[in-house]
A protein has these predicted regions:
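FAD-binding core/adjacent interface of flavoenzyme oxidoreductases
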Residues: 1-9, 66-157, 233-241, 252, ...
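Predominantly flavin-linked oxidoreductase catalytic cores and closely associated redox partners
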Residues: 106, 112-209, 214-223, 297-302
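FAD-site-proximal beta/loop scaffold in flavoenzymes
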Residues: 115, 137-147, 250-301
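Beta1-alpha1 glycine-rich phosphate/pyrophosphate-binding loop at the start
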Residues: 4-67, 71, 145, 154-200, ...
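Hydrophobic alpha-helical scaffolding
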Residues: 55-58, 62, 188, 241, ...
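Rossmann-like nucleotide/phosphate-binding core characteristic of flavoprotein oxidoreductases
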Residues: 1-5, 81, 319-418
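A Rossmann-like FAD-binding core segment of flavoenzymes
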Residues: 72-99, 175-262, 352-385
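A conserved FAD-binding loop/helix module that cradles the flavin
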Residues: 294-335
């Protein structure tokens, strides 16, 4: 049986960075990817805006992935492409993975695992769209794959449900390719995507955005013929009498992303109900010792640069992993936060500057965020504005916090003085 220090599952941006981090820390590393090429979703992202933080340049997704692939080739990590992980079992102080690839079935042993499995898109059935099941109802990522990788046009007259970033980007992309985009319809009262994408993808191209609207029904036999849209109330329930029918041949869905964590759940990794990803500590180790997580499998990120940051940190931590007892301090947040990651601090690991990511639950003006350790204020930071679609990053020095097992770290939001 082949033995590795670290096995990484998923060869997208997080997995590439994790493999690089593990190899730089001296670990014998295997990166497992189910597709024929590394890069994950970046392979179909031909728009720019990637790499401003990591490389100080504005790159396309393909260029960003290529840079990491080239770095990976030079560091000596092994890769297994077109390979699925069908099973992971705990074995002694490590793990045994069953891999299915072109050469058949094989097993490998790992001292530590990094799960970088990314996320998947919600479908029409997950957001309760009723009606028939014609062709032409597809997720924004699928539409992007058709256009950017296959050179096929999936729509001529379409509408987009949901204002997530990929939906906004595809509204622009479809328009550039000659499709008529009737509008972007969002059930929430505010958009779900980044402000810059609202501006660059919709406003610059004259594409209307309808908030507090949703699709209630799709109609068509073999191909989509029309959709029914309606206004929604504060609880996002359709308002009777506001329905209208729109003729179109395609409905593009951008209604949210869900971290892929079937393997994590099979290993008994506890998940956070808010992020839908695993609970983890400051080294990205989950509550199952030796299992690390990073990227969109942990929580859905806005920027690939942050995905790579978590990947490199998780890979390096996995390379250093030695089975030992943990002393966990819990991280909690008041009602103003949607979530905070990481959710635990292992007090047996060296304390120092720790990066936290969070999203607010609702849009806020000038806001002060304070961090308390057992009731004592450690630090505070003032934000001019907070929006749920825009993830925030906060670095806190925990070296003088005096944390111990059972300590409690609390994030608090309060209105800042004007």
């Amino acid at each position: 049986m082949e033995r590795y220090d670290v096995v990484i599952v998923g060869g997208g941006p997080a997995g590439l960075a994790a493999a690089l981090g593990a190899r730089r820390a001296g670990a014998k590393t295997l990166l497992v990817e189910r597709e024929a090429r590394l890069g994950g979703i970046l392979k179909q992202c031909i728009h720019d805006g990637f790499g401003l933080l990591r490389f100080g340049e504005r790159l396309s997704g393909c260029e960003y992935a290529h840079r990491y692939i080239e770095m990976l080739r030079g560091c000596g990590a092994q890769t297994a492409l077109l390979t699925f992980v069908s099973r992971i079992e705990k074995s002694g102080e490590g793990f045994v993975l069953t891999l299915v690839g072109r050469e058949g079935l094989r097993k490998v042993e790992a001292r530590a695992l990094v799960l970088s499995t990314g996320c998947r898109e919600r479908t029409a059935r997950q957001v309760s769209i009723h009606g028939t099941r014609p062709a032409g109802v597809l997720t924004a990522g699928t539409a992007q794959h058709y256009i950017n990788r296959m050179g096929e046009m999936p729509a001529r007259r379409c509408m987009i449900l949901g204002s997530g970033d990929i939906g906004l980007i595809m509204a622009r992309r479809l328009t550039l390719e000659g499709a008529q985009v009737l509008g972007v319809y969002e059930a929430k009262p505010t958009p779900s995507g980044l402000s810059r994408n609202i501006s660059q993808c919709l406003e610059d191209f004259g594409i209307p955005l309808y908030t507090s609207h949703t699709v209630t029904r799709v109609s068509g036999k073999e191909r989509l013929e029309r959709v029914t849209v309606a206004e929604v109330d504060a609880r996002m329930r359709p308002i009777p009498g506001t329905e209208q029918e729109l003729e179109c041949d395609s409905l593009i869905l951008s209604v949210g992303l869900i971290p892929e964590n079937e393997l994590a759940e099979a290993l008994g990794v506890p998940l956070d109900a808010r992020t839908k990803g695993p609970l983890c500590d400051q080294s990205y180790m989950t509550l199952v010792p030796g299992v690390f997580v990073c990227g969109n499998a942990l929580h859905v990120n806005d920027l690939v640069d942050y995905v790579s940051e978590s990947g490199e940190a998780a890979g390096a931590a996995a390379a250093r992993y030695v089975p030992a007892a943990c002393g966990l301090a819990e991280v909690s947040a008041d009602g103003g936060f949607g979530y905070v990651v990481p959710q635990r601090i292992d007090t047996t690991k060296p304390a120092g500057k720790t990066t936290f990511f969070f999203r607010p639950l609702a849009e806020r003006g000038k806001t002060r965020v304070r961090m308390l350790a057992d009731g004592r204020e450690l630090c505070k930071k003032t934000y001019m504005q907070l929006k749920p679609p825009e993830m925030e990053r906060m670095v806190v020095d925990l070296s003088g916090a005096g944390l111990h097992a059972g300590s409690r770290l609390t994030f608090v939001m309060e209105e800042a003085d004007t």
